């Protein structure tokens, strides 16, 4: 009789645990209606303390941040933007170099659109009517975004006369379309880092200029009437040292990740470890979604209220 009672108790406990798990899954809700995702190519964490970036530092003060998000190796653009958007390491998504325009290793999984699953694709599947856009300066971005899952993607014209063009295009897009997910990827301070050098007066002058653009993008959400419904993310693919990157120094692999807005704690510096491929799962968490099994990234749950 005693054994039967024990088994009965265990059965009740198992059923209760299963019910709780199902309830937790059912309660997973969207945290914010809009995500504004801003990327600065070549922005190393080493520069943040010294940089004159009042808009970025206001986001840091109002939200959560880490200066120890690590890039995947090599610490170059294509492979890291891919890892950021695809929630996985190069061995899985197959993009392995700075200028990858297609996979060099066969993708472990392709769900649709002939590309490894991206955060854009998974949001599109969950919200077929959502406005999703990606605007960028470097043409390599279009190869890792899954443009078929966006409503709008566009590259800015090239040339010094178009320095502020991405900012203008981003502001117009936000005001007109109020994107559910809008990604705006600047190709600086990377160029300045290559030309004048990292950790130079020219590099910091460029960061100040980029911070002004970030301020205009934030203002655009206010003008569009969506500011209170937004989460803002500002991050980078890699840093740099002297005139380059691609190596293993902390100056090259430590990148900022800053998140603020609706439903985000005013928590200051994050205490958890973060990798490049944790960005996409964190974005999906905002929309109440989970990544596919093939993703290795984890959502940064610490940042949410």
Predicted ranges, named:
Residues 139-154, 168-212, 216:
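Active-site His/acidic residue clusters
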Residues 18-19:
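C-terminal motif of bacterial Sec signal peptides marking the signal peptidase cleavage site
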Residues 85, 248-290, 301:
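Substrate-binding rim/cap in mid-to-C-terminal beta-strand-loop elements of soluble/periplasmic
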């Amino acid at each position: 009789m005693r054994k039967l009672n024990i088994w009965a108790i265990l059965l009740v406990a198992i059923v209760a645990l299963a019910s709780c798990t199902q309830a937790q899954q059912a309660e997973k809700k969207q945290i914010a209606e809009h995500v504004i995702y801003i990327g600065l190519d070549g922005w190393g964490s080493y520069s943040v303390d010294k940089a004159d970036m009042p808009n970025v530092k206001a986001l840091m003060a109002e939200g959560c941040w880490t200066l120890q998000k690590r890039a995947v190796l090599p610490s170059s653009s294509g492979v890291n933007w891919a890892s950021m958007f695809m929630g996985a390491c190069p061995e899985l998504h197959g993009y392995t170099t700075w200028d990858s325009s297609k996979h060099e290793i066969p993708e472990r999984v392709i769900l649709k659109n002939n590309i490894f699953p991206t955060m854009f694709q998974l949001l599109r599947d969950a919200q077929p009517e959502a406005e999703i856009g990606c605007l960028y300066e470097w043409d390599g971005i279009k190869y890792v975004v899954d443009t078929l899952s966006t409503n709008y993607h566009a590259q800015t014209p090239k040339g010094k006369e178009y320095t502020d063009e991405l900012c203008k295009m981003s502001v117009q897009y936000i005001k007109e379309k109020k994107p559910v997910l809008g990604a705006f990827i600047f190709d600086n301070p990377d160029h300045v880092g290559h030309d004048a050098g990292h950790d130079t007066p020219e590099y910091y002058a460029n960061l100040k200029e980029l911070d002004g653009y970030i301020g205009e993008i934030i203002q655009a959400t206010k003008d569009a009437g969506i500011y209170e419904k937004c989460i803002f993310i500002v991050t980078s693919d890699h840093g740099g040292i002297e005139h380059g990157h691609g190596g293993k120094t902390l100056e090259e692999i430590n990148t900022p990740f800053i998140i603020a807005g609706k439903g985000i704690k005013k928590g200051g510096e994050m205490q958890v470890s973060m990798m490049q491929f944790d960005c996409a799962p964190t974005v999906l968490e905002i929309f109440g979604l989970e990544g596919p099994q093939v993703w290795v990234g984890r959502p940064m749950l610490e940042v949410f209220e």
